[in-house]
Amino acid sequence: MARVKRGVIARARHKKVLKQAKGYYGARSRVYRVAFQAVIKAGQYAYRDRRQRKRQFRQLWIARINAAARQNGISYSRFINGLKKASVEIDRKILADIAVFDKVAFTALVEKAKVALA
């Protein structure tokens, strides 16, 4: 059986990892062994945070809607319940946008929710 030397493949793999680690601090961008661990960990963080981003944005939207709803004299949960009863199907992302940029329209939605709750 012939001896297999893996110089080309190993170099290619090392180059690939070091390219991914470009911009990392110190040995993390220069030493393959350290860079490999850093790249693996970065991938784990990226995977986790792609899921967390969705949660965090929803939390932000809810906080903004709650603040705007309370300025109009209604709590977030009662406001959402009122919108459901009034069969207004606007998602939280759009509601938060309306709350920040169009106060008049948001006030109209609050009034609609209050009427549906009464």
UniProtKB/Swiss-Prot annotation:
GO MF, one example: rRNA binding
UniProt key word rRNA-binding: yes
Q: Which Gene3D superfamilies match?
A: 6.10.160.10, Ribosomal protein L20
Q: Which GO terms describe its biological process?
A: ribosomal large subunit assembly; translation
Sorted keywords for this record are: Ribonucleoprotein, Ribosomal protein, RNA-binding, rRNA-binding
Gene Ontology cellular-component terms for this entry are: ribonucleoprotein complex; ribosome
InterPro entries per record:
Ribosomal_bL20, RIBOSOMAL_L20_CS, Ribosomal_protein_bL20_C
Record's PROSITE patterns?
RIBOSOMAL_L20 (PS00937)
On the tree of life, the source organism's domain of life is Bacteria
> HAMAP family, per this entry?
Ribosomal_bL20
Its annotated function is as follows: Binds directly to 23S ribosomal RNA and is necessary for the in vitro assembly process of the 50S ribosomal subunit. It is not involved in the protein synthesizing functions of that subunit.
Per the record, the similarity remark reads:
Belongs to the bacterial ribosomal protein bL20 family.
Q: Which NCBIfam families match?
A: rplT_bact (TIGR01032)
- Name-wise, this protein is Large ribosomal subunit protein bL20
